[in-house]
Every structure is written in C-alpha cells, then in structure tokens.
C-alpha cells in the first residue's frame, strides 16, 4: 500500500516495528492461524510455506483484510501505464488487470493500493493472474472478501518466489564482544553458522535454528547498539515481496513472534538522524565520491553502504548506521 511504501522510509527499525508488531496483530494473527488451521495445513503441505509467514504478510499488508486501499484499481493502473515515468512496469499490470476484469476476478468498483495491488495480501494483477487460488472452493477467486482465497494465493506466490520448506528465515542473536568485526554485517557477506559462532555470536534461543554448515547474513537494522539478527536464505523471499530493509526485517520478526519467539531486545540504539541531518550527511558522502543514490534524506541501501565505507576509512565500528557523532566527525 501507499503507506507501506512511503511513510516507512523515514522511521527507524525500532520505531517502525513498534507500530507494525502491535497487540492487535499478535492477538488476531494467532486467532487466524487457529481459525484457518486446516487451510494453512493444506497450504503448508502443497507449497511448503508456514502459516506464520503467510499470516505476518496478511497482518502487515491489510490488518487481515481490514485496510485494503480505496483507490480504483483499473483507473489507477490506466493512469500509471500512460502517464508514469515507469510505463514498462505498469503497462503489463494494466493488461493483467483487464484480464482479471474479463474473468470476473475484479470489477469496475474494485479498489486497492495506488500501484494496483489488490486484496487482503495486496498482490499485483499479474501475480493474481498467475497464482490466484480458490481457497474456499466456491468456484470464484476473490482476494478481497475471501481470507481462504488470499491465504492459498499468498502461499502459491511465496513458494514461487523460492521459499525453501522446513528452513528458518530469521533469528535474533546476541553479540557481547566489544571488539566484534562489525564490517562483517550486511548483505552479500554471508558466512556459515560455525564461522559466526567463532566470532562470538550467540543465538537468543541458545541453540541456532540451522546447522553449522548453513549460511546466514548478519543484519543490523539499527546499528551495533540495536537489535541484531541472522537472516537465512528464506529471508530473500521477503526482499522479493518488498525491497524495504525495515519492512522485511519487521515482517520476518512478526512471523517469528507467531512461531513463539520472544520480542526482540530493544537495547538502546542511536536514534535515526533527522531529515535535515540525513540530507546533510548524504551531501557530504556524495561530495567525497560515495554513491548514496538519490539525496532524499532516506537511509536506503546505498546510503548505508556508503556509511559503512566511510566508517571503515575512519577506523570506526562499521555498522552502516549514521549517527550524530559520525556527522560531527565529517563536518
């Protein structure tokens, strides 16, 4: 939805996840897992996707169908396909939406998100066309009104994105070593569990969810003072669903909470820089030859990467998290 794409970008991980992982979602998620137990079992045996993973997306996207967006799907996509800066992205979605209309899956009154996502798990028309399932066996695919259709369709899509059955996705870890090599964290620097253990990483569960040979990536969504996670290859499916770092770690942690894991340790992370300071930081990095992408005050992947590089250059703990202290040094 518009809200998930835009307003999440300015929040820190702890602030965003406090809002996203609330009591309403935790309580109703568990209730829904119980209520649709048989269907979740079918989804798991057919597609290998756990109920907790589907339910977390269902919660994050629409609060279990409560907030599905009120923008007319066909007219939104018609506009985006013709007037937008990325017609090559939206034209196929508009054609797919017309196909859905001809099949009776959506109609002229169908509403959803600004970019054409529809239904309780907010899927694009092309994905609904490919993966739409009739979960309640009433002869129709209705992702807006039928939770059963939404659950089974989400399972089919998540499976197609590459979900590995019976494998973990994320787990919280503890790092007590003050001299830990923080530059080893982040995307593209995965190593075996045995190697992380040697560096002093401990699972919050006491025992790691995967074997010593399994590769995982250390994620620090809010720097070395914030919560820490090891992400397994199934975490990549979250990034294919939504490429926001903060959204994906939150959705993965929410799925873990439904599986009985504890709330992450908040610790006392440094606050996120204000918009003004973030823009200042990006300008300084850019003028020093670092590629931050767009100077927009948003801590995206390229800005994090640039922060890490300059931290290494300055001999600081390289956790990719920009702080007031870093900005003062650069000033």
Per-region residue spans from a language model:
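Residues within the helices of the helix-turn-helix
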Residues: 41, 279, 283
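Short acidic, glycine/serine/threonine-rich helix-capping segments at coil-helix boundaries
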Residues: 271-278, 286-330
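Generic hydrophobic alpha-helical scaffold/packing signal
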Residues: 252-255, 282, 308
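Catalytic glycan-binding domains that act on GlcNAc-containing polysaccharides
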Residues: 1-215, 226-230, 235-250, 254-255, ...
């Amino acid at each position: 939805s518009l809200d998930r794409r835009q307003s999440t970008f300015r929040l820190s991980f702890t602030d965003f996840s406090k809002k996203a992982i609330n009591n309403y979602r935790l309580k109703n998620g568990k209730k829904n897992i119980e209520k649709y137990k048989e269907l979740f079992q079918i989804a798991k045996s057919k597609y290998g996707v756990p109920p907790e993973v589907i339910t977390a997306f269902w919660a994050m996207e629409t609060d279990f169908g409560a907030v599905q967006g009120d923008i007319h799907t066909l007219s939104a996509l018609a506009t985006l396909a013709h007037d937008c800066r990325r017609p090559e992205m939206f034209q196929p979605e508009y054609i797919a939406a017309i196909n859905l209309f001809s099949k009776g899956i959506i109609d002229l009154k169908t509403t959803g998100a600004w970019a054409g996502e529809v239904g309780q798990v907010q899927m694009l028309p092309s994905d609904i066309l490919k993966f739409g399932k009739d979960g309640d066996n009433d002869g129709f695919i209705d992702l807006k009104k039928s939770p059963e259709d939404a659950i089974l369709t989400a399972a089919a899509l998540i499976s197609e994105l590459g979900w590995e059955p019976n494998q973990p996705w994320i787990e919280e870890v503890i790092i007590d070593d003050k001299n830990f090599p923080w530059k080893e964290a982040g995307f593209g620097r995965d190593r075996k569990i045995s190697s992380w253990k040697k560096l002093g990483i401990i699972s919050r569960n006491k025992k790691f969810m995967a074997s010593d040979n399994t590769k995982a990536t250390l994620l620090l969504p809010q720097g070395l003072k914030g919560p820490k996670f090891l992400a397994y290859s199934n975490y990549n499916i979250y990034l294919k669903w939504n490429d926001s770092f903060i959204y994906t770690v939150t959705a993965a942690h929410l799925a873990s909470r439904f599986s009985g894991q504890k709330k992450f340790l908040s610790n006392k992370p440094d606050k996120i820089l204000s918009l003004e300071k973030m823009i200042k930081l990006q300008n300084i990095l850019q003028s020093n030859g670092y590629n931050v992408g767009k100077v927009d005050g948003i801590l995206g992947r390229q800005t994090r990467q640039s922060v890490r590089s300059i931290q290494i250059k300055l001999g600081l703990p390289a956790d990719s998290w920009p702080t007031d202290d870093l900005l003062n040094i650069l000033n």
